Every structure is written in structure tokens, then in C-alpha cells.
């Protein structure tokens, strides 16, 4: 997969290039990243990429000309049909489903805004989709872009050493992940790993993990549960959990 990054701070993307799973994917030629700095496409000696906002107001707005030139160059490099995604608080929320949708593209151009944002006319002329990573505001689009890239890269075939790592992740099946434990089996304070995980009975372990995924999602993200078509067995697990929870409260 190919990424084109439009950013005035391309150095920030060394984190993607140099560390962890994403760095390994780049080294193995499963991913390529090209950065296009709008300052390189300016026409004045100060390399100006922003200006004041028409109508007044605080903050500066990123200019149309250098951004459009950077996007055009990115399209020439990655392909004229490459989808342009603008990382913006006004965009649709990024989630696992959106990640899978974006994976259908062989290449993506990620536009990272700064200041108060970009000239609206650039969005009208070049942006195919606006994506937000949450209902909060950051200083720029670079961190959201890296978040999106990391999420997509780890979903690519053969990027993770164990393909089960992707299948068992939170949100892959619409549920949160189950609890994980490692050695020692018992901590000095007596807190122990659930016995079933030490039993070696893979069928019972799978049942326990499914139950934990359902309960954890119900407790922390009921909105996800409401969007799923649960099996009769899954529904029974949750019904039993709710009954046990009420009974436990009644005994307190």
C-alpha cells in the first residue's frame, strides 16, 4: 500500500518509518510512504503556507495554492485516481469498519491541516473524504494521519507475524478484546491468572475468551452490542451475566 502525506512537518512521520510493525512493513516493501511539504510548492521567498481568514477571526488558514500543488504532485506520484483524505474534526469518525473500507485502496493521500484548517475551496476541489479520530481538537493532522496509517498497515496481509493477532483484536468482530495475562501465574499480592487459561483445554479457553469479550463490551461499550446480530448462545451468555450481576448486588 502506498501513502502520500501532505504535511508541513514531514519529520514527524519518522515514527512510522523507524519503529515497530509499521517500520517492518516498510522495510519488507509492503508499504511505501512519500511526503509532500506544501512549503516546497510556495511561490514567495518566505515559503508562506497560511494567511488570515476572510471575515476575521482568530487563527490562520492554510492557503489553497501550495496545498493544491502538493496534492497534484502526490497524485502524479501515486496515481491520478488516488483518494484524498483530509484529517479533520469535522469528518466522520474513524473506526475499524472505516479502516477496512480504506484498505480497498492501493494508495491514499492523507492531508494534514494546521492552524484553523484549510481553505474550504481546497476541500471542495480535492478532498474525497474527511475523517476524524475523535471529538477533540489537536494541533494538526499529523498524529491522526499516523493513527490511521498504523491501523491500516497492521491489517495488511502478512504484516503481523501471527495473523490471529488481527482476528483477535478489539473491534475485528465488533467486540472489545478479552483480558490478557502473562507470567507469573500468581503475583506477590496473590492476584492469580484465571484457572481456565492454565488448563490447556483450548475449547474451554475459547469459550472463556468469548464470554469475556461479550461481557467487557456490554460493560464498556453498549453501543457496540446494540449494533451486532448476536447468536442465541451469545445472548444467553449476556442474559446469565446480567442475572448474576443483579443477584450479586442483592447480596451486598
From Swiss-Prot:
Cellular compartments annotated: Cytoplasm
GO annotations of cellular component type: cytosol
CDD domains xrefs: TrmD-like
Subunit structure: Homodimer.
Protein name (record): tRNA (guanine-N(1)-)-methyltransferase
Residues binding S-adenosyl-L-methionine, per UniProt: 113, 133-138
Disulfide bonds listed in the record: none
Transmembrane segments: none
Gene behind this protein: trmD
Organism of this sequence: Francisella tularensis subsp. holarctica (strain LVS)
First-level EC class: transferase
UniProt-listed Enzyme Commission number(s): 2.1.1.228
Catalytic activity: guanosine(37) in tRNA + S-adenosyl-L-methionine = N(1)-methylguanosine(37) in tRNA + S-adenosyl-L-homocysteine + H(+)
Function comment: Specifically methylates guanosine-37 in various tRNAs.
One GO-annotated biological process of the protein: tRNA N1-guanine methylation
GO MF entries: tRNA (guanine(37)-N1)-methyltransferase activity
The keyword Cytoplasm appears for this protein: yes
Homology family: Belongs to the RNA methyltransferase TrmD family.
Keywords: Cytoplasm, Methyltransferase, S-adenosyl-L-methionine, Transferase, tRNA processing
Amino acid at each position: 500500500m502506498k501513502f502520500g502525506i501532505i504535511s508541513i512537518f514531514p519529520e514527524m512521520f519518522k515514527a512510522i518509518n523507524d519503529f515497530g510493525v509499521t517500520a517492518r512493513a516498510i522495510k519488507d516493501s509492503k508499504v511505501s510512504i512519500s511526503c509532500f511539504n506544501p512549503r516546497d510548492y510556495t511561490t514567495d521567498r518566505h515559503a508562506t503556507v497560511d494567511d488570515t481568514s476572510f471575515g476575521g477571526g482568530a487563527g490562520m488558514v492554510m492557503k489553497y495554492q501550495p496545498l493544491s500543488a502538493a496534492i497534484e504532485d502526490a497524485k502524479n506520484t501515486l496515481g491520478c485516481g488516488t483518494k484524498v483524505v483530509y484529517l479533520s474534526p469535522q469528518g466522520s469518525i474513524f473506526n475499524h469498519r472505516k479502516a477496512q473500507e480504506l484498505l480497498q485502496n492501493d494508495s491514499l493521500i492523507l492531508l494534514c491541516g494546521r492552524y484553523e484548517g484549510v481553505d474550504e475551496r481546497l476541500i471542495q476541489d480535492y478532498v474525497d473524504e474527511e475523517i476524524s479520530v475523535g471529538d477533540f481538537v489537536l494541533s494538526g493532522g499529523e498524529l491522526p494521519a499516523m493513527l490511521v496509517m498504523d491501523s491500516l498497515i497492521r491489517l495488511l496481509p502478512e504484516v503481523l507475524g501471527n495473523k490471529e493477532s488481527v482476528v483477535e483484536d478489539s473491534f475485528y468482530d465488533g467486540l472489545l478484546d478479552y483480558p490478557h495475562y502473562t507470567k507469573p501465574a500468581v503475583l506477590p499480592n496473590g492476584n492469580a491468572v484465571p484457572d481456565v487459561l492454565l488448563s490447556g483445554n483450548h475449547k474451554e479457553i475459547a469459550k472463556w475468551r468469548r464470554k469475556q469479550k461479550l461481557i467487557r463490551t456490554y460493560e464498556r461499550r453498549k453501543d457496540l452490542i446494540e449494533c451486532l446480530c448476536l447468536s442465541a448462545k451469545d445472548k444467553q451468555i449476556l442474559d446469565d451475566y446480567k442475572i448474576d450481576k443483579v443477584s450479586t448486588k442483592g447480596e451486598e
